[in-house]
Amino acid sequence: MINMTETKQLKLILIGDVNVGKTSILHRLIFSKFTEEYKSTIGADFLSKTFYQNDIITHIQLWDTAGQEKYWCLTSAFWRTSDAVILVFDISNESSFRNLNFWYKQFKSKSINPDGTEKQLPILLLANKSDSLTRAVDQSEINQWCTDHKVNLYYEVSAKSSINIKESILKLVEVIIEQDKDSDNEQFNDSPDEETSSITLLGTSKKHDNTNPNKPSTSSPSSCFNCK
């Protein structure tokens, strides 16, 4: 009997202030390494990674974008082909948290379907540098921001210490796939009264990427809280 494995292609976009660690997060996920050397991203670039989980092969494009407004050049057409957005801030830098409102408005204004309706992208919020001795943002403020902006996925991560990097991305991929299934079921049943299930994420875990049960392959370079 032939085992048919499903294949998914996903495009994820990282946005946030300069120097919050977007590039470091990608390098930790893709190459399992961290460097102290800082180089600002200009425009946008991407890295690719393939994961296998739950009998699904998922090819992911992770887009690293500039954290400076003058380099913000992502068009509506770019966002139409996106499957999710990853908002990143530095938990030791309060201004990077305050500026989440700017980045949220930016991608919301660009995420427009061809028919003019707003594209409802899943959002993952990452508080990077969770291993920092200085915490500048109170947890209650983060929870309130998540509630105000209807963000259900939030992780505290560290690219330097490899905390929750892989776990957070895999959870986002899981949510995207589940939403796709729900959408397909709604279209198949064609029932306006059908109830859709909500996903509740609870708990914090600080596992390191070296515990790798899925053995994901790299293709080409180019503390979860329930926010209610």
Swiss-Prot record:
UniProt motif (Effector region) ranges: 38-46
InterPro entries listed in its UniProt record: P-loop_NTPase, Small_GTP-bd, Small_GTPase
Signal peptide segment: none
SUPFAM superfamilies found in the cross-reference section: P-loop containing nucleoside triphosphate hydrolases
A GO MF label: GTP binding
CDD domains in the record: Rab
Covalent lipid adducts (S-geranylgeranyl cysteine), residues: C224
Biased composition (Low complexity): 211-228
Chain sites annotated for binding GTP: 16-23, 64-68, 128-131
Segments of skewed composition (Acidic residues): 185-196
Gene Ontology BP annotations: vesicle-mediated transport
PROSITE patterns: RAB
Any Pfam family hit: Ras
Keywords: GTP-binding, Lipoprotein, Nucleotide-binding, Prenylation
Coiled-coil segments on the chain, per record: none
Disulfide bonds: none
Region called Disordered, residue ranges: 183-228
Matches recorded under PANTHER family: RAB FAMILY (PTHR47981), RAS-RELATED PROTEIN RAB-7A (PTHR47981:SF20)
Family statement: Belongs to the small GTPase superfamily. Rab family.
This protein's name: Ras-related protein Rab-32D
Organism: Dictyostelium discoideum
